[in-house]
Amino acid sequence: MIKTIVMSLLIFAGMVAYDSATSKPTPTTPPTKQEQQQQQINKHEKSAAMALFVSLLPDRKTWPSPMQKFYLAFNMEEVIDPIRQNPQWTPLKSMSQDIPKALIAIEDHDYYNHGAIAVDGVLRALLVNITAGEVVQGGSTLTQQFVKNVFLTHEQSMERKIEEAILSLMLEDNYTKDEILELYLNTTYFGAGANGIKQAANKYFGKAPSALSLAEAAVIAALPYAPSALNPLENPQDCKKRQLLVLAAMHKYGMINQAQLAEAKAERIRLSNGTRI
């Protein structure tokens, strides 16, 4: 048992070290056309090599779970590409920019500055929650949350956490921060049967994601933490409390100013069922 724990910690430490060594800051300029073409060539070469290798193996459904996860780490597009073809898909640039800002503020405020795994984020979240006297902030990055929701189960085990770490690192090696954020918002369950931002905006406000106000975006960002318990149609008071935490976080991290904070807090939001919060 002790040996297993020690090995698990060593593997996790290795993943964090790998992340620190390979994570790249968000580029200040978009890649050139030549760089984009080279990226596509590299991607196709990798896919072709993997396809040839896999063709020599038994049916993938018969592989042990660890082997399936290893394959998935290098072929994430098999899962992600179909998701992007969903008619409900909403590009990041086509939604109110208050939505991603609100989500980042409450779930992972340093999202654009750290890698797939933020060890300091776990410790910081613990301190914030102790200070607040309640769970205000989670320790997982948005990348880890997306991986857990789409590729893995919610099982609480050391094996699952290691798989989550590995897949998160591989995801950030192959997709940009904006792409991962867009994937997160289009796949997350927001409660009341709403999967993805388009369904959530329509379900709770009868609006498109592009039409949400700052106050409404803060409601949406409040939901991933506990989508059923915070469903504003069923639990408006609890949702309002969490929404105020989101707005406070946005102000704290410089995403909105004092006037915007005051206006959003004062807004009487009308939900799709006529309730105002």
How would you label these PLM feature ranges?
Residues 1-277:
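Juxtamembrane regions of bacterial inner-membrane/periplasmic proteins
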